[in-house]
A protein has these predicted regions:
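Interfacial segments at transmembrane-helix termini and the short loops linking adjacent helices
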Residues: 119-135, 320-349
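Interhelical loop/hinge segments that connect adjacent transmembrane helices in multipass membrane
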Residues: 6-21, 184-187, 191, 200-242, ...
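Membrane-water interface segments that mark the loop-to-transmembrane alpha-helix transition
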Residues: 24-35, 61, 66, 70-119, ...
Length: 434
């Protein structure tokens, strides 16, 4: 029989494991701060220097550029991270890196083709082609950083340091070089230049340990197929959070897009503070579900309790504080953004719900196909509602389209788990934990 006494060696190992998890969480939150919270430092400056119309053009170009980032990144930060983490030897890691690199070359070509089509088909982009191309190219370069590799070897701090450094330098350059609406393309040029430097540094770090191979295109296509489920989810999710300014710009003037963009940046930065926790816990949940399904369910419940409570608090703060927040961050010219911010605050609990039930549970359980169906349906609903509401209700109509489609995604995930008796809150799983 084994005694109930835990030795100092085991206690030390557990403490080190918990410290590593905490360190990863801090590192991922550092990246997220650069991605979401740092714009709150630059947006007050840009909103006052550019004004609603120019900010709307920047928001629309950036939203389309994010489509390019989404296409090139594809979801490798999850699919390739998992493969790197479970690779058996250096040769396998080298093959994964080569396959991802090949896939990103193919995807970059697709993103550039889409940008060329948009430059011809979208009136605002025809009038401002430089803004479009600088936005697209900068976002593509950002997606080339091999963050998946550093996540896979549990060196999240390296990716975090590179990303944060690039964004801080770009932010400083923005204050120095952007002085009026005509300087708007410099915003994307700064982002692209700093991203290119971090891309080079990241690949130098990788090359010191592994030989960089020329990709085999067959393996690149296999990598694309394996990451398809995550790409679909991230595509739908990013339409809710990043691509809406572009969609609105198809139906509304730049000033209206500016009102929406300002409120969306505030909402995304605030609500987005919840997502890094899911990013860190995903690989741990994937590992835990193989050894103890009930423990994995318990961790999912606990995470949802925490994120659910925080998301409700965030939503209430955004709703009640909208006038003060908008005036403080955007300025007096953006009063119409107050209503948009209130509407978007309603999506906070829905985002927490989809992050946990989607990333941390559905995918971990291998329900990629169901995941795809839910996200594609939600994406179609978002697009349909945008087409119906944006022409008539402008920026507030777009905000409602986002909230409704996000809610449908959350309910769809819950219903799927309930029907399959995999709901982590079910009595059966709770009793198994008792």
């Amino acid at each position: 029989m084994t005694s109930g006494v835990v030795g100092p060696g085991l206690l030390w190992a557990r403490a080190r494991g918990q410290t590593a998890l905490l360190y990863d969480i801090v590192a991922v939150y550092g990246i997220h701060f650069a991605n979401q919270a740092l714009p709150l430092v630059t947006v007050p400056y840009l909103s006052r220097i550019l004004g609603p119309s120019a900010l709307g053009l920047v928001g629309m170009a950036q939203a389309f550029g994010m489509y390019g980032n989404l296409v090139v990144d594809y979801g490798f930060v999850y699919s390739a991270t998992r493969q790197i983490a479970t690779a058996s030897d250096d040769a396998e890691v080298e093959a994964i890196i080569a396959s991802v690199s090949g896939a990103k070359i193919l995807l970059s070509s697709c993103a550039l083709l889409l940008a060329a089509i948009a430059c011809v088909a979208v009136p605002l982009f025809r009038e401002h082609p430089v803004l479009l191309w600088t936005a697209v190219l900068s976002e593509i370069v950002k997606a080339l950083l091999p963050a998946y590799y550093f996540y896979g070897i549990q060196r999240v701090a390296i990716a975090s340091t590179l990303d944060i450094s690039a964004r801080l330098v770009a932010a400083v350059g923005l204050f120095l070089l952007v002085k009026g609406p005509n300087d708007a393309p410099k915003i994307f040029l700064l982002n692209g230049a700093t991203a290119a430097i971090t891309f080079a540094i990241g690949h130098v770090i990788v090359s010191t340990r592994y030989a960089l191979r020329w990709p085999r295109w067959r393996d690149a296509f296999v990598m694309l197929r394996e990451g398809w489920a995550m790409f679909l989810f991230r595509s739908a999710h990013n339409v809710y959070t990043l691509g809406n300014a572009f969609v609105l710009g198809l139906f509304a003037p730049p000033r209206a897009v500016g009102y929406f963009t300002g409120a969306e940046k505030i909402s995304t930065a605030a609500i987005g503070l919840l997502s890094p926790l899911t990013t860190v816990l995903y690989p741990r949940a994937a590992s835990l579900v193989k050894s103890s399904f009930t423990k994995a369910a318990r961790m999912t419940r606990f995470t949802l309790y925490v994120m659910g409570a925080l998301s409700v608090i965030l939503g209430v703060i955004l709703w009640l504080g909208a006038p003060i927040i908008v005036n403080l961050i955007l300025g007096s010219k953006f009063v119409p953004s107050e209503g948009v911010l209130r509407i978007l605050s309603l999506r906070a609990p829905m985002i927490a719900w989809t992050n946990i039930f989607g990333f941390q549970w559905l995918l971990v359980l291998g329900l990629e196909r169901q995941f795809q169906k839910i996200t594609v349906i939600a994406l179609l609903v978002n697009t349909l509602l945008a087409v119906l509401l944006a022409p008539r209700f402008s920026y507030e109509g777009m905000a409602w389209a986002v909230v409704v489609s996000q809610s449908m995604a959350a309910l769809g995930m819950f219903a799927t788990l309930q029907m399959r008796e995999l709901n982590p809150f079910s009595k059966k799983l709770k009793e198994a934990n008792a």
